[in-house]
Amino acid sequence: MIRHTLLTLVAAAGLALVGSAPALAAQPYPLNFKTFALNASDSTRSGTTLSGGSLTLASSGLGGPSAYVDTFANYSGDGADGSGSYDSGTWTSGVTGLGFGFNELVASWNAKTPSGTWVQVEVQPQLDDGHWAKWYILGQWSSSDSDFHRTSVGGQGDADGFVSIDTLFTKDHPAVAYRLRATLYRRSGSTATPTLSRLSAVASNLTNQKGSFPSQTTMTGTGVDLGVPPYSQEIHHGEFPQYDNGGEAWCSPTSTAMVVEYWTRTTHTNYSPTPAEYAWVPYPDPQVDFTARAVYDYHYNGAGNWPFNAAYAASRGLVADVTQLHNLREAEPFIRAGIPLVASVAWNSNKLDGGIKSTNGHLLVIEGFSGDGSKVIVNDPASDTNGQVPHLYDRTQFERAWIPASGGIVYLIRPTGWPTPSLTANNS
């Protein structure tokens, strides 16, 4: 998958490059991950109600009807058209204040969207000069594309910030607080409702990463290899051009498909798509093609939208977040807990021994560590065959390909109730 790296985006916006800030005492860069309680007392609702801890549309008090134009109607002759009149309800969080100024934020959500429904997630940052910026749309999402084309939203940039695919970046001023808003939509006249069960966000400031890596391992002599099923993205080259043509463009859905299948095999619960669901795919490993279509961002024209991949995994019955880790030391507890991680990386000039020569943006699965922690065991979908997918990468080289490229972005996918290490709440 080709997507702009953090360094490219920050430079293009005229912001400080990673590592260009004055040297600081060695400490991890600040980040904050938060899961929002949908029943929080400081949140507000309009046209929505809580049922079993999840958010649905209420029976009355809905907003609308409002018109929506699906700019991707009948995309590639698929016959789908989300245009029409919609009723809606909203949930708005209270203010989340942070102990640091952040310059990027990624939200993620878990939702069910029956036919004719979809959800929109927005963020409103408060900048360090005290003023509140506008609401930025982070995604318009439905699990199916049969009657709505899920999409990121371009052209939102202003003096305060911009959204690149799925990530809010601030400009001249960092943000010190933010609010999230989720809007649930259904076609006017329908009784169907989306169900939002989880909403989270990770905010960070990556202008100085000194102290984050290289990291010291916590491994104590016994290696861990979770044995995630290996899928190659390359065997799908040329498949379904309307979903970005397979091959190098499908690293994210291939990685997501690997982890979903891992949980299917580990828990003996069928999270993966069934043969009936992927009957339209005439190729080997059809679950990869199915996933690529199910995460495809019709505005971005790609399958690498981070929250869309997490939302897809959640739509299969799992719990999923997009978050950030400072280094592999923080990844090790997840591996020991049996939880593989999908990581966003980039490198050039053969800087990762055993990997492809270079990539502007790539996703792969962290599935283990050697006993001394010097090697990270990875399922790298950028391999010619499934059998060649497992790789052993140097720890320090991997961190250098991961942290500067994405700030340690991972998809954290696991079953409901699975024992999960604590995520970084605040490290400033």
PLM features per residue range, with description:
Residues 93, 277-427:
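Conserved active-site-adjacent core of cysteine acyl-enzyme catalytic domains
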Residues 1-25:
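Secretory targeting and sorting signals
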Residues 10-11, 109, 132-135, 229, ...:
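Tryptophan-centered motif/residue detector
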Residues 24-227, 376:
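Beta-strand-rich ligand- or partner-binding modules
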Residues 117, 251, 362:
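Histidine-centered active-site/metal-ligand motif
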Residues 185-302, 371, 427-428:
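Active-site-adjacent structural segments surrounding the nucleophilic cysteine of cysteine proteases
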